[in-house]
């Protein structure tokens, strides 16, 4: 089997359920999407190919539209990014979740129903109620700050720092608090290569000044 064949069968086995939940299957997004004026959700599956074996996993991509539009301008980008990507392992409370997402091995058509069921069950148990929570800017901000506090490399980088500053600006935090975070984030990037460091420093300064 090829990945496109597996994806088509997963769609066949799950589309009716997700349609009822307000999602639309989008092939290029690897799964199901839901869009409002405030956010864009992509809940679906990513895979690694070791033909004839494929390893599938479940992932939730969360894009807060206003945050990402500002970040796009700040970095002079081309496409909107994701405010954060949640792997199923996060919801399962797995230690070092960022690198330990559960995997479903698919080699034959008979392996697919178990993954399709997991996609539905995980949504019902974890993701459905999480979406209205995490798409609130204040909750996303608190989540990102918690992740930064863990010291994890995945959360201590310019992408997360700049999004935190954007959220603080949008939520009208006192400028003193924002500047305190700015100083903290700049110190965390102090070891970066000089040219990159100056780019990120300028981007963060522009966010704090509202230059977008």
Predicted regions and their residues:
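Intrinsically disordered, low-complexity regulatory regions enriched in serine/threonine/proline
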Residues: 2-7, 33-212
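Amphipathic alpha-helical segments
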Residues: 3-26
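Long, charged, glycine-rich C-terminal linkers/tails
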Residues: 26-33
């Amino acid at each position: 089997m090829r990945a496109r064949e597996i994806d088509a069968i997963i769609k066949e086995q799950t589309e009716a359920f997700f349609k009822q939940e307000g999602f639309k299957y989008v092939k290029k997004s690897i799964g199901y999407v839901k869009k409002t004026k405030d956010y864009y959700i992509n809940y679906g599956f990513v895979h690694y190919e070791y033909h004839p074996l494929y390893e599938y996993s479940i992932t939730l991509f969360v894009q807060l539209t206003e945050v990402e539009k500002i970040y796009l301008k700040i970095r002079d980008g081309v496409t909107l990014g994701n405010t954060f990507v949640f792997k199923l392992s996060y919801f399962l409370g797995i230690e070092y979740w960022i690198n330990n997402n559960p995997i479903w091995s698919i080699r034959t058509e008979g392996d697919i129903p178990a993954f399709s069921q997991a996609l539905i069950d995980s949504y019902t148990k974890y993701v459905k109620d999480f979406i209205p929570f995490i798409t609130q800017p204040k909750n996303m901000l608190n989540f990102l700050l918690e992740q930064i506090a863990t010291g994890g490399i995945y959360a201590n980088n310019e992408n997360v720092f700049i999004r935190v500053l954007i959220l603080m600006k949008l939520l009208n935090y006192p400028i003193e608090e924002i500047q305190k975070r700015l100083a903290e984030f700049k110190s965390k990037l102090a070891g970066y290569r000089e040219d990159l460091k100056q780019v990120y420093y300028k981007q963060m300064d522009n966010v704090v000044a509202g230059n977008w």
